[in-house]
Each structure stands twice: as structure tokens, then as C-alpha cells.
Amino acid sequence: MSIKYAYLGPAGTFTEAALLKIAASDDQLIAYANVTAALDAVRKGEVSKALVPIENSVEGVVARTLDELASGEPLVITAETTLPVTFSLMTLENKDPKDIKSIATHPHAESQCRSFIAKNYPNAQVIETASTAAAAKGLSKGDYDAAIGAAIAAKYYQLKIIAGDIGDNTNAVTRFVVVEKPGKSPVATGKDRTSLAVFIAIDHAGALLEILNEFAKHQVNLSFIQSRPTGSQLGHYHFIIDAEGHVEDKPVAAALAGLKEICEDIRFLGSYPQAK
């Protein structure tokens, strides 16, 4: 049975490239304009699952994804995948590279390709776009001289790649998560990750230490922790945490039980296999 996926679009983004790694050939892949729209499509039942980026090894967390998971109608992560982020410089077929005066791309891509741009096109105007795929689409219409994005975008918009792997960090990787409506967690594999949004009742000295101690007490390792503003008032934060292990593992279950005693609220964001 085919699955209907939402993903951060438009077509030709790194998110689509990541989704193609895990989706079946008969699955339906539907592009949405932003992370919020993709996740709302799951909430509304328009799709069964969504794939969205959650962190990048160079740029850090994707704040919109973290905030959407921590608030609104609950959703859970059921899988994750990673994708090496390799940027390409592309132009129209008849464009001479020497004539490039404007380069369009997403701000994150620009920040990861600054050395290449400074060395090869120091006088080019860099134009920000909503996504790398949007830059490629605009280029196909003649809006810019060149675009920086994923190689998959060049195929979509019939563009010529004139330089590949132009990122300053050749080991850049983005982690993506599959998100669904709450249900039964995937079966424990022995190499899992449990994600949580943890809310403290009163922001006080040692609050984070109390949370960390619960995991340390039960020898549960944390692979990710990020504070995010609650939006209620200045200085109030909650924490997004990734713990190694499955919610059905005794150490993780014990740590969660301890957190419930000291935290105002805990939102379970899923237990799922770690990406290979």
C-alpha cells in the first residue's frame, strides 16, 4: 500500500533527495512551502507522514521543526535519515561561467559556500531565496545568472552543473525526521533514539542540572539537547532532548518517570531507530 508523504518543498530540495532514499517507488511525495505546512498536512490528515529537516552539522538546529514538534497538536517522530549535503553551482546551458554576475541560493547554502564564492565570484551579487530549489527554479526562468543548490534541482529544471561539491565543509550532513500522528512506537531495535520536549514549572538555578541528573542516574546517554523559548515571556525556555534508547527500555522508562516528578510537562516526541 502506497504512503502519502509531505516534505519541505519545492521539488528539487535536499529534503526531497532525503525522502527518495526511504520512500517506496509507488509512494506519493507532495511538496509543501514550509515546515509548518508540511506538518499541518499530517495533522489535517492530508498525508500520512511528513519528512522535515531537524539539524545540520554545520548550521545547527532547524528551529521551526523543533518549535512545531513542541507545540500544537501532538505529532511523533517514527524514523530518521541523514543526507550528505553537497552543493552544486548551476547555470543555464548557454551561460558562460565568466559572465556570472548574480548567484541565487538559500542563506544557509550561501553561508556554507562562502569560500568558493569569494574565490571564484568575488564581485557577484548573492540573492537570497526561500530554498535552494526556488533558486534553481528562478534560474530556469532567467531571473539570475547562476544558482547554488542540490544536484537533483539541476535535473528538474534542466540546468547545467558547472561546479560540484563546492561547500566549505565537505563533511556537512543534515538529519531529517519522519513525523506522524501519535500511535504505537516502532519496535525497539537495540539502537534507538527517544525524543522529548521537556517543560520546567519554574525557571530556576539548577533546573537543567536536575533534568540531566535523571538521565545520568539511570545511565542514559543524551545525544542532543537544545533550549527553545516557550513564547510565553522573556527568559522562559523548554528543552528538546534526544536520549539514546527506546521508551520501552527500562533505563529510559525510569528516567522519564523521574522527569515527570520534577517537570511541569513532558511531551513524548517518539522512539525510533537511529539512522544507520
Describe the predicted segments one by one:
Residues 1-276:
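Domain-level signature for soluble enzymes in the chorismate/prephenate branch of the shikimate pathway
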